[in-house]
């Protein structure tokens, strides 16, 4: 443990996301989630980094980087807040990029740095940390041992579906009511609209497909319709183009004839399909086009041998109707001054 050294890069710019060690560390773990990729973090920072200070902590053993902690500092209400790069609202999973066996030491070194650094901070506000990864416990324990005040809360849940080997096995895994409803809805749309099909976006169709997705999203009722503000659409577009270039983008449509009636925006890598966002035509809600499209993507994922269908954050009921299990996400706040809460 003592042979490992923590380096802190406080004069970072976008070039820090091109560190070869980051790409190597990301590639080393076949189950690393998409939000740990340098591509995701770079696009997020370039779009939302104004008014923030970027710093990258790297833990090295000899010449080998074993962990990366991408952080930023922002002043809010006269307090200097540290957070994971990726923010709160747009990045579903956050935390250090490291092997699970190194979580304890990463927490050790991170908390040690918080206690000794000249870099000014008041609160380390760590959001969206998946409970199964287990970093939360290490961070809280080390912060408490070091005498820092802290607060721990579950802030949201994600939902994941571990895929079986066949569609029949998948249907059998659902409870009887959910299975009956899914079959009924799929039969109804086939009966009433036999020209219904699923279409995947390609590099050649991406420009037009993004416009279809944005228009459909903005046509939704309530908060969903208001979410796709211009700056959010720009971020989605930049992610789409960056991920399309490396084969990670999944932009899919349910079409009746030549008309799109539902769409999903997601990613695929490491045998996992991530469902990041979706939209459907509200005038056709009776036919559940969004649910039908997602069920088709589940079917396709099973057929192609993927391991996980990750619905990501959000409490939407349909995720659990389709057999997903809840994954709690924790928020830990570490206070430079104050007592434990």
Residue ranges with predicted function:
Residues 6-62, 66-83, 129-158, 162-286:
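A conserved beta-strand-loop-helix scaffold within acyl/acetyltransferase catalytic domains
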Residues 321, 331-333:
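Short functional hotspots where side chains directly engage DNA or cofactors
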Residues 53-54, 74-154, 270-326:
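Acyl-donor binding region in acyl/amide transferases
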Residues 336-341:
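Alpha-helical membrane-targeting segments
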Residues 224-226, 251, 306-311, 328-331:
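Acidic/polar loop patches that form or flank catalytic/metal-binding clefts of enzymes
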Residues 1-5:
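Short, low-complexity, intrinsically disordered N-terminal peptides in bacterial proteins
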Residues 203, 315-316, 333:
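Conserved beta-strand edge residues that scaffold enzyme active sites
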């Amino acid at each position: 443990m003592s042979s490992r050294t923590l380096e802190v890069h406080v004069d970072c710019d976008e070039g820090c996301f091109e560190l070869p060690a980051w790409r190597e560390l990301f590639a080393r773990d076949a189950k690393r989630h998409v939000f740990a990729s340098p591509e995701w973090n770079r696009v997020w920072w370039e779009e939302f980094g104004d008014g923030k200070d970027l710093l990258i902590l790297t833990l090295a053993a000899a010449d080998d980087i074993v962990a990366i902690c991408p952080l930023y500092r922002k002043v809010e209400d006269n307090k200097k807040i540290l957070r994971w790069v990726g923010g709160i609202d747009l990045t579903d999973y956050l935390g250090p990029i490291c092997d699970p066996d190194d979580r304890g030491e990463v927490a050790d070194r991170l908390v040690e740095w918080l206690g000794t650094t000249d870099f000014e901070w008041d609160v380390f506000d760590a959001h969206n940390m998946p409970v199964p990864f287990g970093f939360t416990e290490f961070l809280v324990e080390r912060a408490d041992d070091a005498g820092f005040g802290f607060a721990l809360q579950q802030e949201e849940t994600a939902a994941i579906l571990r895929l079986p080997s066949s569609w029949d096995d998948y249907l059998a895994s659902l409870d009887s009511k959910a299975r009956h409803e899914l079959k009924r809805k799929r039969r109804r749309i086939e009966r009433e609209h036999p020209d219904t099909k699923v279409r995947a976006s390609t590099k050649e169709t991406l420009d037009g497909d993004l416009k279809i997705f944005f228009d459909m999203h903005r046509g939704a009722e309530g908060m969903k319709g208001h979410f796709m503000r211009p700056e959010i659409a720009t971020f989605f577009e930049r992610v789409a183009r960056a991920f399309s270039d490396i084969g990670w983008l999944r932009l899919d449509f349910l079409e009746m004839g030549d008309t799109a009636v539902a769409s999903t925006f997601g990613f695929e890598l490491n045998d996992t399909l991530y469902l990041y966002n979706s939209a459907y035509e509200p005038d056709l809600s009776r036919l559940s086009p969004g649910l039908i499209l997602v069920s088709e993507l589940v079917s396709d994922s099973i057929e192609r041998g993927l391991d996980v269908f990750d619905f990501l954050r959000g409490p939407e009921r349909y995720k659990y109707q389709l057999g997903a299990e809840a994954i709690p996400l924790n928020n830990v706040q570490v206070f430079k001054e104050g007592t434990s809460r």
